């Protein structure tokens, strides 16, 4: 691997693994509102928001940090009132109870209009227009949760990258394979990849805060209680499940707790991190081993998401747990061959799990994903692998990954449409 390629990979990871407070879809909407408000230069009197179906789906049932409320309207209101676009996915970190009350007034006065953007192919699209004093400003995010492609005030266009995105082009030229991911994680100079330890610090802290509270369905807290001893035993496996689900519980309930995200998703960041951290800590692994295992996990997720896309009908925990399965397999002493076996086992098991939006019950899916990650790693260490005569698995692990992402990005499009239709017509 050349030094240039190594630096490209590090830059890619630093773009994709970033802190986030709250579910990234409503937070990305708040970020877009903040940018439009800043461009307008005044408190908006009216805010019009147009969203792709996938953004709408992921923002309907999730808690907004620091508000005790669910859904988009309060995220939009706070983006206008206290949001700072420089904070990126921590855009709402300056929220106060007073701002929440003011935000409720904006909602009650019907100053916020949220609609589906028709006739677009983008799965991640946010368009916000803010109006005040006869002036208006527009901001558009597309392709990535923090990727602004258009900003304008009145007739003055300040940014227009709608045709081409240099950042996306750079990512496309970096062609990853599982072998390349594995080699990078094991050979990159330690000081160049030490930053990945921040994922362990932030995401473990989120889980520990969740154990102290009562968030969402409190699955993590429940698993850590009497059930852990009575049913699963006080084991590494049970701790992996409780820590991972606890962090997800807090996040989906809207706790004001930052987590380290991966590819625009906090739950993916949690699922790629905590199983690896818990396994490493409870098995006495060194700091270097933890760093390399975390890097393998997170870069595997980024690699798979390159062909899947940021949002799809496929639950993101399938991808993120595949990353953690790789990290755990390597920590168990696995070779590249066994890491590849773990990936094949994951794809054979979890492909097809639907995404029906971000919400507290995501903790259940995350727990399913990481329990399968451990199972897949154990099978791999016994040199057991789902074979190419079975279902969608190919002899070549990278082709199996492409089969997974093809199902998620193409095959499940109708599933996505039906899921959103069901979600938007409940009780009708």
Swiss-Prot record:
Pfam families: SDH_alpha
One term of GO molecular function: L-cysteine desulfhydrase activity
An annotated GO BP: L-cysteine catabolic process to pyruvate
Annotated TM spans: none
Family: Belongs to the UPF0597 family.
Name of this chain's protein: UPF0597 protein BF3560
Lineage, top ranks: Bacteria, Pseudomonadati, Bacteroidota, Bacteroidia, Bacteroidales
């Amino acid at each position: 691997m050349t030094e240039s390629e190594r630096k490209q990979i590090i830059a890619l990871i630093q773009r994709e693994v970033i802190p986030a407070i709250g579910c990234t879809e409503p937070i990305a909407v708040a970020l877009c509102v903040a940018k439009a408000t800043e461009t307008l230069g005044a408190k908006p009197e009216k805010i019009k928001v147009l969203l792709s179906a996938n953004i709408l789906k992921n923002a309907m049932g999730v808690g907004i940090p620091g508000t005790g409320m669910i859904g988009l309207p309060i995220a939009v209101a706070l983006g206008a009132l206290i949001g700072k676009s420089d904070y990126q996915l921590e855009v709402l970190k300056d929220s106060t109870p007073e701002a929440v009350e003011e935000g409720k007034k904006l909602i009650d006065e019907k100053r916020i209009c949220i609609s589906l953007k028709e006739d677009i192919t983008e799965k991640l699209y946010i368009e916000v227009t803010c109006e005040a004093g006869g002036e208006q400003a527009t901001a558009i995010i597309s392709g990535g949760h923090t990727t602004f492609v258009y900003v304008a005030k009145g007739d003055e266009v300040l940014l227009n990258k709608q045709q081409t995105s240099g950042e996306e082009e750079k990512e496309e030229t970096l062609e990853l394979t599982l072998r390349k991911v594995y080699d990078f994680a094991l050979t990159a100079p330690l000081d160049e990849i030490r930053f990945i330890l921040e994922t362990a610090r932030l995401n473990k802290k989120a889980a520990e805060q969740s154990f102290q509270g009562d968030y969402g369905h409190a699955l993590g807290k429940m698993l850590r209680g009497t059930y852990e001893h009575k049913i699963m035993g006080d084991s590494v496996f049970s701790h992996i499940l409780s820590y991972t689900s606890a962090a997800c519980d807090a996040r989906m309930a809207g706790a004001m707790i930052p987590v380290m995200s991966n590819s625009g998703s906090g739950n993916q960041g949690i699922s790629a991190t905590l199983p690896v951290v818990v396994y490493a800590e409870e098995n006495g692994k060194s700091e270097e081993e933890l760093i390399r295992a975390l890097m393998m996990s997170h870069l595997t997720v980024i690699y798979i998401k390159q062909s899947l896309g940021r949002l799809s009908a496929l639950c993101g925990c399938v991808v993120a747990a595949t990353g953690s399965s790789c990290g755990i397999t390597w920590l168990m002493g696995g070779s590249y061959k066994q890491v590849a076996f773990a990936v094949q086992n994951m794809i054979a098991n979890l492909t097809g799990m639907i995404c029906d939006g971000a919400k507290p019950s995501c903790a259940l899916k995350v727990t399913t994903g990481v329990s399968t990650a451990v199972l897949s790693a154990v099978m791999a260490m016994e040199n057991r692998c789902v074979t190419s005569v079975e279902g969608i698995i190919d002899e070549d692990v990278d082709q199996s990954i492409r089969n997974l992402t093809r199902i998620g990005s193409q095959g499940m499009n109708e599933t996505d449409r039906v899921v959103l239709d069901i979600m938007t017509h409940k009780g009708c």
